[in-house]
From Swiss-Prot:
GO terms for biological process: translation. GO terms for molecular function: structural constituent of ribosome. Pfam families: Ribosomal_L30 (PF00327). Belongs to the universal ribosomal protein uL30 family. CDD domains: Ribosomal_L30. InterPro entries: Ribo_uL30_ferredoxin-like_sf (IPR036919), Ribosomal_uL30_bac-type (IPR005996), Ribosomal_uL30_CS (IPR018038), Ribosomal_uL30_ferredoxin-like (IPR016082). This is Large ribosomal subunit protein uL30. It comes from the Bacteria.
């Protein structure tokens, strides 16, 4: 299965609670921190919630 590299590029200051929790669920806490996750429906839903705070690349 394909994997996605997700990098946080913007701060969570001023973000809503659901957006902060989505980033924590993805494993992101700091700007420029990256994680690799499976490309599935759950991950895509979390990314959709915080698409303006992260960048996504296929690995």
């Amino acid at each position: 299965m394909a994997e996605l590299k997700i990098t946080q590029v913007r701060s969570t200051i001023g973000a809503r609670w659901k957006q902060r929790e989505s980033l924590r669920t993805l494993g992101l806490r700091k700007i420029r921190q990256s994680v690799v996750r499976e490309d599935n429906a759950q991950t895509r839903g979390l990314i959709k919630t915080v698409h303006h705070l992260v960048t996504v690349e296929e690995v």
